[in-house]
Amino acid sequence: MQQNIIKVIVGSKNPVKINAAANAMALLFPDYEIQTQGMDAPSGVPAQPMTDSDTRQGAINRVHYCQQQIEADYYFAMEGGVDCFEFGPATFAYIAIAHQARLSIGRGALLPLPMQVYQALEAGEELGHVMDRLFNTVNIKQKGGAIGLLTHGHATRESNYTQAIILAMAPFLNPELYP
């Protein structure tokens, strides 16, 4: 008996993002074989998005790029960014998911950032590099991320992306409720 296959393209080659997409889809579609592939996709926004708006647009741009490049059932893009809110600076990620002619946007949890980290970002650095320097790590953005470091491993960048993907999939799981 041949198993049904769902092909997923992720707008990044970062293993954290690819694994989050694969894990979320495996949870949502346990009776399917999930084939997940990452590809480089331009965000069209600064390398370190500093606003909610730029972060969201980066995810949308990546997902649209992927749709134009290769055939798949679902297209995922995750864009991490920072912004300064009324309660202080925080990092978060937007998730853009395309399926057929529909687009769903979701956002991961907000992680409060130390002011010294935010100031380094305002000066032009990227969050992963700042965290590597602060915690003496190497390429943390392809591992637990700032989330893993600041929560002492109780949450990770991947776990945040996985949850955000599952939530952003709601319109595709319940299409009758999202006309």
Curated annotation (Swiss-Prot):
Binding site for substrate: 71-72
Catalysed reactions, as listed in the record: XTP + H2O = XDP + phosphate + H(+); ITP + H2O = IDP + phosphate + H(+)
Cofactor: Mg(2+); Mn(2+)
Record keyword Hydrolase present: yes
Entry keyword annotation includes Hydrolase: yes
Domain of life: Bacteria
EC id: 3.6.1.73
UniProt remark on cofactor binding: Binds 1 divalent metal cation per subunit; can use either Mg(2+) or Mn(2+).
EC top class, as a word: hydrolase
Keyword set, alphabetical order: Hydrolase, Magnesium, Manganese, Metal-binding, Nucleotide metabolism, Nucleotide-binding
List of residues binding Mg(2+): 71
Recorded GO MF terms: ITPase activity; metal ion binding; nucleotide binding; ribonucleoside triphosphate phosphatase activity
Any Gene Ontology biological process: nucleotide metabolic process
Database matches in InterPro entries: ITPase-like_fam, Non_canon_purine_NTPase, NTPase/PRRC1, YjjX_NTPase
Family: Belongs to the YjjX NTPase family.
Quaternary structure and partners: Homodimer.
Function, as annotated: Phosphatase that hydrolyzes non-canonical purine nucleotides such as XTP and ITP to their respective diphosphate derivatives. Probably excludes non-canonical purines from DNA/RNA precursor pool, thus preventing their incorporation into DNA/RNA and avoiding chromosomal lesions.
Designated name of the protein: Inosine/xanthosine triphosphatase
Protein species of origin: Shewanella sp. (strain ANA-3)
